[in-house]
Amino acid sequence: SNLISERDLTAWKGAAERMLTNEIVLKVFSDYLARDDDFEVVLTSKGYTVMGFDCYRQDWNTVYFCPTPEDLLDSLLDAYENFRMMEITGGDRDLTEKEEAKLAKERDALTALCEKEAAKCSS
């Protein structure tokens, strides 16, 4: 039959994840990073680092070292989520359940896009 076995699917997903690169993650998040003035990705001598700026204190308040593309993806997903929460609520209230669901879909879509790009590069 033409159906892919669960084992083959798991192996394929694992291979696609292994092909995830920092460049793919940065490409997928480029539009977001261009819009968010508070977070930057900096290439240090040790590797990529995601830095968050606190505009009220006028200082960097978060620094996440990302030794792997998966770490970079996780850090940027968190930064994106915080950015969107502020965009949606203005920082004045909690997200509604509907807004939380929408944000979860956006996160899933960004993750899926990274996986799709990684799969393209590995084939």
Feature map (PLM): residue ranges:
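Negatively charged, low-complexity tracts enriched in Asp/Glu with abundant Ser/Thr
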Residues: 2-36, 121
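Intrinsically disordered, low-complexity segments enriched in Ser/Pro/Gly/Ala and basic residues
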Residues: 4, 29, 44, 65, ...
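Charge-rich, solvent-exposed alpha-helical interaction surfaces
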Residues: 11, 15, 28, 32, ...
